Regions:
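Conserved, single-site charged/polar hotspot
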Residues: 1-309
Length: 309
């Protein structure tokens, strides 16, 4: 029934992120339990539109404006349906083949290149955390405009060349959009291309433009190491670097507001911590690491190839 609901206690959210914590969550739909390798996996069986009601109020706050929530609904619906169409169901649901086509690795003696996608999801479509999309139950959908946003955009998706767009998103891009092939897999998408998160307003035409010839409007060549270092060590003005507490409290959930250095940040590790982290992430024991050398960057300046010495 549409009114069926259940509650789960001590659900971990923000897995492996600095905001990781536990909370009680309530869900619509039915609960399916799978027992595998002496572990229980809970799967929420729910229709897409009810799922999205939770997603848009988990990824952002239910107090955001109607238009922001509507935009998020279209983006999240597009991503979900694009992902569902892109991975063969026989592979996704075959527990004997967890390392499917979405988990691609090319290795040589001196080079490890791997794209991580959804290889862990062999029993369900998407997970409930930041790895896919936040889905934190109906308690997040605390305002009526969340339901209005879903109803107003019902069935709407973004398309390109007749296909649903894989509309991946982030809360803060660091000032520049990255291209798909430098983050996810070696498949460029024309609708996910490099761009600066900033526009110049022309009062004569009332136009917002990315035009590079206007001061501050263009994106430097961030594949160049010197340009990338300058970009990273400074704070070029983007839309996503706001310190306006009113705006942040309107669009972000409470625990997201705890992170104030989301645009430019710094982490420090000891040699032992760095070695342990790389071993955990890559499965390779490099021993004592004495240097990290940038080899190749994407169009936003993010590293996609790194030399470990």
């Amino acid at each position: 029934e549409a009114t069926d609901a259940f509650e789960l206690l001590d659900v971990t959210i923000g897995i492996n992120f600095h905001w990781e914590r536990k909370e009680d969550q309530r869900f619509l739909g039915s609960l399916k339990i799978i027992v595998e390798n002496k572990k229980l996996t809970g799967i929420n069986v729910i229709n897409v539109e009810d799922y999205l009601t939770s997603v848009i109020s988990s990824e952002m706050s239910a107090t955001a404006s109607l238009e922001l929530l509507k935009a998020h609904a279209v983006i999240s619906r597009s991503w979900l349906l694009a992902i569902d169409n892109s991975i063969d169901n026989s592979l996704r649901h075959d527990s004997a083949a967890p390392n499917n086509a979405a988990n691609c690795q090319l290795s040589t003696v001196n080079c490890q290149l791997k794209w991580y996608e959804r290889d862990a999801h062999t029993r369900f479509d998407v997970c409930a955390d930041d790895h896919c999309q936040r889905y934190q139950g109906i308690t997040r959908a605390s305002t009526e405009i969340v339901k209005q946003a879903i109803a107003a955009t019902r069935g709407q998706v973004l398309t390109s060349d007749g296909k649903i767009c894989d509309a991946r998103f982030s809360k803060c891009c660091g000032g520049a959009f990255e291209e798909f092939q430098y983050c996810w897999e070696d498949t460029p998408h024309p609708y996910l291309r490099k761009q600066r998160d900033f526009r110049i307003f022309n009062p004569k035409t009332c136009d917002l433009s990315f035009e590079a010839t206007r001061p501050g409007g263009g994106l430097p060549d961030l594949t160049d190491e010197q340009e990338a270092e300058t970009w990273i060590r400074t704070s070029p003005p983007p839309f996503c670097n706001t310190t306006n507490k009113r705006i942040l409290s309107q669009v972000l959930n409470n625990y997201d507001q705890e992170t104030t250095d989301f645009y430019r940040w710094k982490m420090e590790y000891t040699q032992e911590e760095l070695s342990a982290l790389i071993l955990k992430r890559s499965g390779i024991d490099y021993g004592q690491i004495i240097d990290l050398v940038p080899i190749a960057r994407g169009t936003s300046g993010r590293l996609w190839k790194l030399k470990i010495v």
